[in-house]
Amino acid sequence: MLRNQIDKIRLLFRKDRESYLCFYRILGFYPHNIQIYEQALLHKSSAVRSEKGRPLNNERLEFLGDAILDAIVGDIVYKRFEGKREGFLTNTRSKIVQRETLNKLAVEIGLDKLIKYSTRSSSHNSYMYGNAFEAFIGAIYLDQGYERCKQFMEQRIINRYIDLDKISRKEVNFKSKLIEWSQKNKMEVSFELIEQFLDHDSNPVFQTEVRIEGLPAGTGTGYSKKESQQNAAQMAIKKVKDQTFMDTVNEAKSQHSKPSEVETESVEPELTESETMEPDTLETEAPEAETTADKVETTVNEVEATETEKE
């Protein structure tokens, strides 16, 4: 409380107080370093650069915010649902931090109106709001620390916009989402049961691996094949947002398309070989052509000899 009063007094002497007030309405407290929050709202298409000429965007803050958000929501869910299994806690957390939910939360608190991006860029996508929300969480963490960041999530986000009991019961079909993504992007996705074992209570446990274009994209365990597939698909959905992984997938996909070219090239030597046999055929026929010519010449000589005798 005292800190906010001091910040209010300082704010009176700042030229950029409107920006501070804007963030205060979202956060419930005044930022210490407002530049971090402004950078959290810079999409990579904005083409903003630092004084040294380096591009400024929210991608690094997004990376940090993703990890912090997982930790905070995991903390909240763990304490809210005592006695629940790890699979239940993981699924509940995933429903909160999935991109669709974060997109909606960004709009709810007004971040969508503050994001700076280029309208001419094709990189503008449906995940931009959710990515900015993660970057915003990263900014809070750097500016205020973990506890203040957790307080923001509990008081300003979850208590206002998320019903934990309701969302924990909501079924999300991650496998269907992954298959839909694969069809849209023309990627080959497969699910493989790689292990089956018993837990300490002798309950059967299944482990499934998801492969995208033959590359491992996620593994999941569960007390049924369906549950293990869902958990594996959930991990894969997160994995496909990693650009480095997707570069590897696209390279693998391009390699898979090359065998047809190799097969086409392998036919050419056979055609060439058959073509090289034609001179042999001509050489074989050549003696026959010469024999016929000899016969004609012999016949002509005989006719001339006969005419000479008559004379």
Swiss-Prot record:
Mg(2+) binds at residues 62, 131, 134. SUPFAM superfamilies: dsRNA-binding domain-like, RNase III domain-like. Gene3D superfamilies: 3.30.160.20, Ribonuclease III domain (1.10.1520.10). One of its GO terms (biological process) is tRNA processing. SMART domains: DSRM (SM00358), RIBOc (SM00535). Digests double-stranded RNA. Involved in the processing of primary rRNA transcript to yield the immediate precursors to the large and small rRNAs (23S and 16S). Processes some mRNAs, and tRNAs when they are encoded in the rRNA operon. Processes pre-crRNA and tracrRNA of type II CRISPR loci if present in the organism. This is Ribonuclease 3. It comes from Bacteroides thetaiotaomicron (strain ATCC 29148 / DSM 2079 / JCM 5827 / CCUG 10774 / NCTC 10582 / VPI-5482 / E50).
